[in-house]
From Swiss-Prot:
Example GO molecular function: 4 iron, 4 sulfur cluster binding
Cofactor note: Binds 1 [4Fe-4S] cluster per subunit. The cluster is coordinated with 3 cysteines and an exchangeable S-adenosyl-L-methionine.
GO biological process per UniProt: thiamine biosynthetic process; thiamine diphosphate biosynthetic process
Name this polypeptide is given: Phosphomethylpyrimidine synthase
Superkingdom assignment: Bacteria
Gene: thiC
Amino acid sequence: MTQLEYALSGIVTKEMRIVAEYEGVDEEFILEGVKKGEIVIPSNINHKNLIPKGIGRGLSTKVNANIGTSDAYPEIEKEIEKLNVAVKAGADAVMDLSTGGDINQSRRKILENSPVPVGTVPMYQAAVESISKYGSIVAMPEEFIFEVIEEQAKDGVDFITVHCGLTFESLKKLKDNGRVMDIVSRGGSFTIAWMLHNDKENPLYKHFDRLLDIAKKYDITLSLGDGLRPGCLEDATDSAQIQELIILGELVKRARKAGVQVMVEGPGHVPIDQIEANVKLQKQLCHNAPFYVLGPIVTDIAPGYDHITSAIGGAIAAASGADFLCYVTPAEHLGLPDKEDVKEGVIAAKIAAHAADIAKGVKGAKEKDLTMARARKALNWDEQIKLSIDPDKAFKYRINKNISTAKTCSMCGKFCAMKIVSEYLGTSAMTC
């Protein structure tokens, strides 16, 4: 049985109990959320070392980190390093987007070493292997994508991105209205190329019931991908994007009816003034399914700083109701991220997630900031560093920017605001 089927039967699973304890909520709250499809717990029955996380309504906003090999950088060891960096920095999940080297081995090593849920985009592997097996992506037999999905499911993948909403109906909207950047989703572009070349409907849509059978067998959470997501601000919230979202909403109902956990992916590049509307629309059309967003990135002119542009959008999206943020690294649009980029991306997304959790009133979120404020009032440097979202960086700044024996900080010195005000208020404080 899947987590959803257990919930529908009124059974609290081990995974639900772990999530409830982590979130500081009642088990019944998790049970009801999973039952309604408003919370998912990606947890493949074959991922043995998994510490499950819940994603959805009323829970803390989660962060995903993308890792994986490329043709130019096929070394699996580097991806394991990135995995460890991401988890240490606070990633709640990772996705293996490998397209180079031994893709199967990369995925299995990541699963073996990952305590957090692992996701994939099966179409990536199907496309890469189709080139070697059949000569091109468009020559791929329909059967092959399902063989790849089944293989990844057996390995223990917890959630998969599948671009099931890419249909000839949604493509018509794209053709009729046009775009500056057309399609920027890799999985989406592979799927559309196959559809147009073969003049056949998307097999993941056409044979959605077969996909559900595989997902149900292993309790994989389906992450319904947005193959028509906007790749620049100019293309945001157009008819093609919305048409795909309507189709995904219909598929959400079919997945739930089959007992399969499902979440929905959202747009990548969106102006700030459109973010809240996008989230509200998704929640309405997709029946309050958990919303997984890439960023969204709020301006197109900041290569090298897109961890910042995405954190801005992510905070607004999550505060508006999005549940799961896919990080963006400083290397976005420029190249494959290294482990330092991975850390920067995770930290930026975690900041966005936490800021949103405060706005949403998530249990315990505001209290973290109050504890930090009290540590600052007391000028307790050790406690401030401990409470930091990135303690290592905070510690380095404290050590490198100040004389080791001094109780003052190099910013304020004898003009410390805490010291001056405390003298007049009659409260004790060290100098900062």
